């Protein structure tokens, strides 16, 4: 039986010390595509958390009844089910966000984090630890997206969650040609790549210092 301490480690390890995007370098494609605004970053983070947590739970629940010959396809079917539910929920209640995210919600099924947690952990442990690990892996992915989204939206549009943060009067105009201008690079996908690279670099520095101690 898994102890409470183990439950705690299943939840907190994927948030930082075993972060799937910063440590394992998984799920970076969507990180580049959906982080132009904070709203889309948060939505994708929540969606991946729910899909990974729920799919890991059911993969674990069915692990003793799933033959190895159909293991992968069974996992894909379970993941697809929750991706469809999330996609339809967003279309029904948050259509504007769903339209902005476009195909990327459906492409959660191809996110390596989701399949990775099902294959490497969920099929080896009981359902509760599997759910905690999967959900926390999604949250770990989500906070990285949030950091990138905050930087990109703030410097690319001057807003956060659609609200004006950088005052309009500081921007360049006909009477104030030397004023501030949004960084157009932040709207483009390469900016997310650079920001993610910096975050991974900082994590590697932290880990190397820990190893030297």
Swiss-Prot record:
Annotated function: NQR complex catalyzes the reduction of ubiquinone-1 to ubiquinol by two successive reactions, coupled with the transport of Na(+) ions from the cytoplasm to the periplasm. NqrA to NqrE are probably involved in the second step, the conversion of ubisemiquinone to ubiquinol.
Keyword annotations from UniProtKB, A to Z: Cell inner membrane, Cell membrane, Ion transport, Membrane, NAD, Sodium, Sodium transport, Translocase, Transmembrane, Transmembrane helix, Transport, Ubiquinone
Membrane topology per record: Multi-pass membrane protein
Gene Ontology CC, one term: plasma membrane
Cell compartments where the protein resides: Cell inner membrane
Highest classification ranks of the organism: Bacteria, Pseudomonadati, Chlamydiota, Chlamydiia, Chlamydiales
Family: Belongs to the NqrDE/RnfAE family.
Name this polypeptide is given: Na(+)-translocating NADH-quinone reductase subunit D
Reactions this protein catalyses: a ubiquinone + n Na(+)(in) + NADH + H(+) = a ubiquinol + n Na(+)(out) + NAD(+)
């Amino acid at each position: 039986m898994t102890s409470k301490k183990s439950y705690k480690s299943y939840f907190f390890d994927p948030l930082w010390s075993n972060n799937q995007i910063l440590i394992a370098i998984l799920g970076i494609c969507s990180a580049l595509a959906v982080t132009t605004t904070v709203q889309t970053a948060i939505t994708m983070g929540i969606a991946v958390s729910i899909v990974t947590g729920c799919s890991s739970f059911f993969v674990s629940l069915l692990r003793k009844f799933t033959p190895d010959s159909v293991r992968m396809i069974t996992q894909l079917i379970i993941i697809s089910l929750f991706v469809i539910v999330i996609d339809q929920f967003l279309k029904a209640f948050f259509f504007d966000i769903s339209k902005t995210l476009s195909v990327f919600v459906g492409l959660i099924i191809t996110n390596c984090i989701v399949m990775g947690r099902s294959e490497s952990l969920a099929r080896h442990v009981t359902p509760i630890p599997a759910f905690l690990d999967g959900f926390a892996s999604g949250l770990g992915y989500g906070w990285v997206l949030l950091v990138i989204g905050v930087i990109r939206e703030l410097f690319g549009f001057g807003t956060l969650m659609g609200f004006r943060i950088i005052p309009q009067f500081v921007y360049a105009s006909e009477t104030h040609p030397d004023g501030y201008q949004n960084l157009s690079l932040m709207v483009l996908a390469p900016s997310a790549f650079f920001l993610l690279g910096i975050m991974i670099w900082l994590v590697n520095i932290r880990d190397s210092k820990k190893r030297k101690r």
